[in-house]
A protein has these predicted regions:
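Domain-level signature for soluble enzymes in the chorismate/prephenate branch of the shikimate pathway
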Residues: 1-94
Length: 94
């Protein structure tokens, strides 16, 4: 591969990686924001004597996300990601 093409590809790669770094930072911020809110919800649930795990609510969340998903994220991958997020948030409420 000639040097000019390689240099162009390298710049594209660096640019895309920087974009991913920004997205990752935004995701981290949003995940921490979500966790703070779920901690508050957990306190309210305890005060009300409610269970932490609400399978119906989780199903509603997943169904809504599936309807809104336009891809390329596959439905099963979306489910796995959000099940993990919800599990981590749920465990933090205990």
């Amino acid at each position: 591969m000639e040097q000019k093409v390689r240099s162009h590809l390298s710049r594209r790669l660096i640019k895309r990686r920087k974009e991913l770094d920004l997205i990752n930072q935004k995701l981290l911020t949003l995940l921490n924001q979500r966790l703070r809110i779920t901690l508050e919800i957990g306190k309210v649930k305890k005060e009300m004597g409610k269970k932490i795990h609400d399978t119906e609510r989780e199903k509603e969340i997943l169904d809504r996300l599936k309807r809104k998903n336009r891809g390329p994220l596959k439905e099963e991958d979306l489910r796995k990601i959000f099940m993990t997020i919800m599990k981590v948030c749920r465990q933090s409420q205990i």
